[in-house]
Amino acid sequence: VDGNLPFGSAAELGLTGHHALFLGEWLAQPLYLVAPKPNDARAYFSLRDQLSLPQEQFNLLARGVELNHFYQTHQFCGKCGGKTEQKSDEWAVQCQVCGFRTYPVICPCVIVAVRRGSQILLANHMRHKGGMYTTLAGFVEVGETFEEAVHREIWEETQIEVKNLRYVGNQPWAFPNSQMVGFLADYAAGEIHVQPEEIYDAQWFDCEQPLPELPPHGTIARKLIEATLVLCQQDKNKS
């Protein structure tokens, strides 16, 4: 890097001597990741605070956060323990001793909005502070399809069975390295019995009534909830 950044020089931004990693382009300008050093006292924004950005911009930020996490956690070879070095031609590290090459780890996670007639299933998760209710989600296990993960996660967390799965979309989720894969599903059977280690409370909420605090706009969870509300309204208009 020549020391010049799209919106100022490295010296002007106090980044002289920092390693810059090329991430791609934004508005025809090169975009670099510059990770702060341990003694950096400047204030930084949380990635969660940027969820309202346009999807393309948020994804670029997520890429930077995920790559930074990858390089920080793969400084040594997982095969022989040797020191690794970053590859210049791709996002990867290679062991300087045995040559083993490692690529960024991406952990797929299914996230599902379940509908029962004019109701939507929402849960208050243990990991969330406060009263926010959101969709159910969980990591895909080894040797498992996305659809199998949907059925398993919903059953484990609420004892509810679902049917009629429909893929909606996905979202990079750099907290620290997930890929959220979103589905809509219909209720099939069962009564709610929450998994206490994961879920504080889960309820069926009437789509026509005020809902509790929801996940922020920009999240795939919010997109799934809003898609379910649209389906409920469409069915109401038909009746």
Write out the residue ranges for each language-model feature.
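N-terminal strand-loop-strand
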Residues: 92-134, 161-162, 185
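Cys/His-rich short segments
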Residues: 63-115
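The catalytic Nudix box helix
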Residues: 134-169, 183, 191
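Active-site-adjacent beta-strand/loop module that shapes the phosphate/pyrophosphate-binding cleft
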Residues: 171-194
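Short acidic-hydrophobic surface loop/beta-edge motif
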Residues: 21-26, 93-95, 114, 172-173
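Short acidic-glycine loop/turn motifs at beta-strand connectors
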Residues: 26-27, 116-118, 189
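Nudix hydrolase/Nudix homology domain
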Residues: 1-74, 129-133, 195-239
